[in-house]
Amino acid sequence: MELHGALVASPGMGHAVPILELGKHLLNHHGFDRVTVFLVTDDVSRSKSLIGKTLMEEDPKFVIRFIPLDVSGQDLSGSLLTKLAEMMRKALPEIKSSVMELEPRPRVFVVDLLGTEALEVAKELGIMRKHVLVTTSAWFLAFTVYMASLDKQELYKQLSSIGALLIPGCSPVKFERAQDPRKYIRELAESQRIGDEVITADGVFVNTWHSLEQVTIGSFLDPENLGRVMRGVPVYPVGPLVRPAEPGLKHGVLDWLDLQPKESVVYVSFGSGGALTFEQTNELAYGLELTGHRFVWVVRPPAEDDPSASMFDKTKNETEPLDFLPNGFLDRTKDIGLVVRTWAPQEEILAHKSTGGFVTHCGWNSVLESIVNGVPMVAWPLYSEQKMNARMVSGELKIALQINVADGIVKKEVIAEMVKRVMDEEEGKEMRKNVKELKKTAEEALNMTHIPSAYFT
């Protein structure tokens, strides 16, 4: 019988890329005859352009379909988790009908962490194996399922505690260093639901690898620690699921990088969804200018109230005037800097020999792409689990410096200092050494199969 897998990704490149890469992995290493990937999106044309290099249109074994959503009547003012969960809920009927139409009927179903309600669809359709792909860290999975396992009294004790958050088998950390307590409380219902639904799956795949999160993964394997919280549901590290750089890609940014010295350029990007306020955008511009370092900055129009505003911005912005930047900034930095509107080929930039540092929002895709290319980071978290990611890369892995965003606007002097410390100082050299060692473990993980060979048969 033909082994067919159906994979579903919630909106956003941070979910689409790992799902697509997992699909390729299942075809290449696990004996799948066919994989169909469904991408839920509120903007099909934008999604197609962003994942263009990943599309395998000539391969009938790997099919990508889009599930379009009309969000014109949806309230997009809430937290990102709430917005995305509601979008996935709205897409459930279309997901069900689309999977029902597949021939042959899929025997394996995978959905990312924000689409766990679709596990019930797989159950209704009689699909043999249903799974969740966690597109972020094992630590975030641990946090999600552990918090969902607590009774109400213990949960609020954790939220109000001035002590450490004690997740079994994980390093203790103060709650506010991992999550914004006020935002988490607003997302509590959705987060608890997701944590409860994860353990109804037959297995959980995580976009990480043993050497990156050895202690946390070990705890999931221990029936006395996180294994108990998972109630026997197996957890498999399958990362790094990142899109490889495209050899020979032609782009103006890459041509510019070709002219720069080795590891001399700071790359600045806040992902496909990140946005800064007008004031913060200006401070960042002045900060980059103060460093005197070469830079590539992917810039988007400011957003005053929502740091994830760019995720739902359907305007192209490629030709929009950059009049929100400080007066004269582009002229003063034209010999050392390159400002790019909206989008740049991130994988290729991070893989380029001239790139020496990365100012990032710490979306998990960006973190992994930085690691697999051996680039140290300035961690500047904006939303979702990015605070946890920033804490991990700066505190545990020591491959980044974390900017403190709790005080509001990050001033230009702080930005300049952070960049110089990563690019010029001894601690930056140590971070570069650490991340290049992690890069080797990522390469080893890519050549390994972490799911048992007979698991899907």
UniProtKB/Swiss-Prot annotation:
InterPro entries, from UniProt?
Answer: UDP_glucos_trans (IPR002213), UDP_glycos_trans_CS (IPR035595)
Keyword Transferase in annotation: yes
Q: Which residues bind UDP-alpha-D-glucose?
A: 272, 343-344, 361-369, 383-386
Q: Could you identify this protein by its name?
A: UDP-glycosyltransferase 72C1
Protein's organism: Arabidopsis thaliana
TM annotation in the entry: none
So what family is this one in? Belongs to the UDP-glycosyltransferase family.
Task: List the Gene Ontology MF annotations in alphabetical order.
Answer: UDP-glycosyltransferase activity
| A Pfam family recorded for this sequence | UDPGT
Which keywords accompany this UniProt record? Glycosyltransferase, Transferase
Q: Which SUPFAM superfamilies match?
A: UDP-Glycosyltransferase/glycogen phosphorylase
Q: What is its EC number?
A: 2.4.1.-
